[in-house]
Amino acid sequence: MAKGQSLQDPFLNALRKEHIPVAIYLVNGIKLQGQIESFDQFVILLKNTVSQMVYKHAISTVVPARAIAAIPHVESD
């Protein structure tokens, strides 16, 4: 598993499990808001009034609305 994935997955999964609202900023500056419904290697499903599939390569930043519980530490190689 790539190091990037080993950091992304626990972070996104904690946001999903705890139903934490997030602001997702895209590389073109657009701000999307909602809750993470699901995600995989390439996309995030963001739910607000509708569900949106957002490609990860278009995402600049994911900002949780509040602090999240501790994410398990992943050892680097």
Swiss-Prot record:
GO terms for biological process: regulation of DNA-templated transcription; regulation of RNA stability; regulation of translation, ncRNA-mediated. Residues 9-68 form the Sm domain. PROSITE patterns: SM (PS52002). GO terms for cellular component: cytosol. Keywords: RNA-binding, Stress response. Homohexamer. NCBIfam families: Hfq, PRK00395.1. Belongs to the Hfq family. This is RNA-binding protein Hfq. It comes from Psychromonas ingrahamii (strain DSM 17664 / CCUG 51855 / 37).
